[in-house]
């Protein structure tokens, strides 16, 4: 059913509807072009007919799912867009919006929810924290022996180019599992006055003022 829901969603459309296009489409494996070991395994393609087939095989067409999101406008819009597309595949799904205090108290316990993640410098950092069996923030409860073994191998490979070869297999494993729908990478912005240099926005919103300087 996870794979069916994933196949029902057009990530490019969700980026436009949920975030007004302010970002880049993602490919359902939580590793992106900002990571040195990112492997381009191709875009995610929506396949409504295959989604319907998987739903029929699972016999879950009459079950109603609940998609939970926090009460923040862009996250609500994103979850609404995802739910609408999943309904087009024939699944029943209702939306629940919770205030931030309630949502974040139980964010890792919801069966089906939308969560935002800040960036990490390395793809392996994200995967080890979020998808390895028994990991602290493994909200999806993903547990896959092949994935864990590949991730351990990647974590033990310091060279990014060599790690990329392993990462291609990891990304494919994660996407094929249907464990997440990741529609986009959200753009982050920073404003500064003319003459300020070295003040680029960090993906994790870190402040590195030791790199900032002023033109004379």
Where are these regions (language model features)?
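Periplasmic-binding protein-like
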Residues: 1-34, 77-78, 174-182
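Extracytoplasmic/peripheral linker and loop segments enriched in polar/acidic and small residues
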Residues: 3, 92-103, 126-194, 216
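Solvent-exposed, polar/charged alpha-helical surfaces in well-ordered, non-transmembrane soluble domains
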Residues: 3, 7, 12, 16, ...
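Structural transition elements
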Residues: 7, 24-57, 74-77
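Pocket-flanking alpha-helical
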Residues: 13-18, 56, 101-132, 174
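Short, well-ordered beta-strand elements
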Residues: 62-71, 93-96
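Alpha-to-beta junction loops
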Residues: 82-85, 89-92, 108-117
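Long beta-strand-rich cores associated with HINT superfamily self-processing modules
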Residues: 190-216
